[in-house]
């Protein structure tokens, strides 16, 4: 037994997540297969190369609408019958439409993987889309977005009311649509055209991770290999920064409270090499820096953080902090001092080395299980080539302190954009208004009483 444990602990038995069985079916559909540790389970991801950014502002929700339509049913039993069939196979599914793609996510027992894949193929190929299904899908999307998109909501969107700080800045810079597209105006013809031109085999990637059926490759060629291919659509050019934005703005979030959220946003620079890994390490470093300054040293924020997002063709890095209303000015001063120090001194070598080592170490445990591994492949498709995914740990190791400092210099060359989200009124302001209102009521009452005070009787009317 000791010998067996020793053999199984050798590195050769470790799962190499970078190496996969990848190939193209004759129709151009890309297949990525990986045998995982959990042999009784499979994680399936069907990635279709069409997302929200492939359409202009008026039709941006069109891929999302089609995603919902594909779950409305493949026969007269409708959506319920489709769900019952998947339940009978012991599976669960969902779908997500992002800016870059539409992905169908399925978890299922390994013993039923081919039957579940049959069902996935059926919803892509055989779903009947009609006016009734379209109306139902539109209603679902409206509910997801908070209800009917009327004139009031459209006006609020145009005033940047209710938007997160990063969305507000992206809109101000021209990287994001000022209002959401009107799903009610989308037609059956538009949906069918999208399905015909974008849901093509040569625009899809099928990822299966887990206890793989030994006949799976032959099955996929016989089934998914029959999906039609089309001439790929040309993807639209992403929005670029086209407008100026104010350096500082206060955004109203809610009516009453003393909690404030501070966001200091910077446009990410475009780097020559190892772009994502360098910026990833830089964001981790800044995350530690704001934690150290705002929480540990000054006690201003409980959970400061750093977040990276993309809008159009630009990346955005945001340093965030939860604050009390009276601490905003002090927090702004502390962060300004931090930026000035980084501009002058650069990154601390020892801190950078520690954060880099931690990031590399995290890669060894961050994708545990079939589902996490399938999601990793889904997110790293741009780093896939000829049966291998790029090794993120190796790429992180290659980032030098000099490269990170150069990226930091480019990031902080401008002042950035400060956005402060706070309620319309703080409690102290409310108490002041209440006191003012009570004082006004009291003054008006006193004035009214004095005007109507009864006159004293004169002495001439007294009896003798």
Residue ranges and their predicted role:
Residues 28, 46, 64, 86, ...:
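Buried hydrophobic packing residues in well-ordered domains
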Residues 205-210, 344-346, 350-464:
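C-terminal regions of mature proteins
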Residues 45-106, 173, 288-300, 460-463:
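M16/MPP (pitrilysin/insulinase) zinc-metallopeptidase core fold and M16-derived inactive scaffolds
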Residues 200, 205-260, 266-270, 442-447, ...:
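An aromatic/glycine/proline-enriched structural segment found at the starts
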Residues 75, 82-194, 242, 351-374:
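Acidic/histidine-enriched segments that form metal/cofactor-coordinating
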Residues 16-21, 159-204, 380-408:
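Histidine-acidic residue clusters that define the catalytic metal-binding segment
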Residues 9-11:
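N-terminal signal peptide c-region/cleavage motif recognized by signal peptidases
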Residues 263-265, 283-323:
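A structural supersecondary motif
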